[in-house]
Regions:
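Primarily recognizes the serine-hydrolase "nucleophile elbow" in alpha/beta-hydrolase
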Residues: 123, 129-172
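Short, proline-enriched alpha-helix->beta-strand connector loops that line the catalytic pocket
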Residues: 93, 172-178
């Protein structure tokens, strides 16, 4: 695994709008704060590969936490309690990973996510064709709103153990690929929201003239039954959504090739 570095010691000029933290948690620097003129203070963790020097374009992964990872729960608790950010290192050693600690799962946090993503695209050497987003639980709700506000910024979105809150029309226009993974009987959300979202996305893409093969590249619904959770000794289908970070087929989809 590629080790992280303390970004405060880098030779890369630090953006004036960011106050970098000094605490290292699982390879991520905390508590960084982007001071946005429009969206306020945005707290986040940051992983920078040791070999990043700003000369070569790198991928960017933004991982949105569930309720237990929000900022009021404590600095860095998102990276302590969820593995999406730490596991992502295994899939691309040339990728910056941003782990926002937002204040809720609603519109303000979605706007902050977009602002943070745009900031990294504008101030770091990021490949715009390799910008990935995931959201677990409440973070999935936030991510679905991000897909309403600025889907064109992202290469693919992994939506885990959540429900869909965003308007689908901008997503259809942008054709950003979406993978929705959840338990058939998720104890918090159920699965009706993602089922209905999947059906509506398929319908809208067909109306747009896309073939079923094309649609299958843009929308994936992955419903896990209780047997899947039992095999992994996971009792609760909602809480067990953290384990999707350890499923290679799911993570390979996110970081794979998307036309």
């Amino acid at each position: 695994m590629t080790g992280g570095v303390d970004v405060t010691e880098r030779t890369i000029p630090a953006p004036k709008e960011i106050d970098f933290g000094t605490e290292m948690i699982r390879g991520f620097a905390f508590d960084n704060v982007l001071h946005s003129e429009t969206e306020g203070d945005i707290h986040f963790g940051l992983y920078v590969p040791e070999n990043y020097d700003g000369h070569k374009s790198y991928a960017l992964f933004v991982t949105l936490p569930g309720y237990e990872g929000l900022y009021f729960q404590g600095v860095g608790v998102n990276i302590r309690s969820e593995d999406y950010g730490t596991e992502a290192k295994e899939y691309n050693d040339e990728m910056l990973i941003v782990a926002p600690q937002l204040n809720d799962w609603r519109e303000p946090s979605a706007r902050q996510t977009v602002a943070l993503t745009r900031y990294f695209l504008e101030h770091y050497n990021i490949d715009p064709d390799k910008v990935y987003l995931n959201g677990y639980s409440g973070g999935g709700e936030t991510g679905s709103l991000v897909m309403e506000y600025a889907p064109e910024l992202y290469t693919a979105f992994l939506h885990c153990s959540s429900q869909w809150d965003g308007d689908l029309k901008p997503l259809i226009e942008a054709e950003t690929p979406v993978y929705m993974a959840t338990g058939e009987n998720d104890s918090y959300y159920g699965s009706s929201s993602v089922r209905e979202t999947y059906d509506e996305l398929v319908r809208l893409y067909r109306e747009k003239g896309l073939t079923d093969d094309q649609i299958s590249e843009l929308v994936v619904l992955d419903l896990k039954d209780q047997a899947w959770f039992d095999e992994r000794d996971i009792k609760d289908q909602h809480g067990g959504g953290w384990y999707f970070a350890h499923e290679e087929d799911i993570m390979n989809w996110l970081f794979g090739e998307h036309e």
